[in-house]
Design a protein with these regions (language model features):
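N-terminal leader/linker segments that precede catalytic domains of diphosphate-processing enzymes
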Residues: 1-83, 88-106, 110-134, 139-143, ...
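NUDIX/MutT-family hydrolases
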Residues: 148-190
């Protein structure tokens, strides 16, 4: 694990070096989805682009990340799930990192001026929604003071990174993802009773391997 006294500098260096990549993501991926991604490693040309922000902040002597539970929305394929702040790329965004910063501002009230972006993780294609997700990693420069956007965010979660490094929190379950649709044997992180699975779990899997 990266040493605390130089955490930011070491993390920036590791993000600039070759990343753990897809295999690290696959360790927390649903088996059928992983098989699909292995068979078709290149996303379709018409895939949409989205970006998310893994926002780190220091609290009570430990490093934490920021997750949100999305509101229930029948038009959203990821309705009610736990995820990073993030959303779809818009032409006005320009650089991809601006998407992650904009969405963090809109969803949890964090000003882009309060975020130091350290780098990015491996992009990840989500077949069910046809999005290529670009994960960015940043650190909050000010004190944690988050405000959720009630139209999109039901709850804000700030788990310590230790919740993801603890092997006891890596579990498997069956998930009802839609009416009449149940996924069997889905790996997930149990974070204080919240199920963190899918793309978010895969991104965190690579991030935790990066930390070592």
């Amino acid at each position: 694990m990266i040493q605390t006294d130089s955490f930011i500098e070491q993390l920036r260096d590791r993000l600039a070096a070759p990343l753990p990549g897809r295999e690290a993501q696959f360790r927390m991926g649903f088996a059928r989805r992983v098989e699909e991604l292995r068979l078709n490693p290149l996303p379709p040309s018409e895939a949409k682009v989205a970006c998310v922000l893994n926002l780190l902040h220091r609290r009570e002597g430990a490093w934490h990340t920021l997750l949100i539970r999305r509101t229930v929305n029948p038009r959203d394929r990821h309705s009610g799930q736990v995820s990073f702040p993030g959303g779809r790329y818009e032409d006005s965004d320009g650089d991809l990192v601006n998407v992650a910063l904009r969405e963090a501002h809109e969803e949890v009230g964090v000003s882009p001026l309060e975020v130091q972006v350290l780098g990015r993780l491996t992009e990840l294609y989500i077949p069910v929604s046809n999005y290529i997700v670009h994960p960015f990693v940043g650190v909050l420069l000010g004190k944690p003071d988050f405000t959720l956007q009630p139209g999109e965010v039901e709850a804000i979660l700030t788990p310590p990174l230790s919740a993801f490094s603890n092997p006891d929190n890596r579990k498997i379950t069956d998930l009802n993802v839609a009416q009449g649709v149940t996924l069997k044997g889905v790996p997930y992180f149990d974070v204080d009773g919240h199920i963190v699975w899918g793309a978010t779990a895969m991104i965190m899997s690579e991030f935790m391997e990066l930390l070592g």
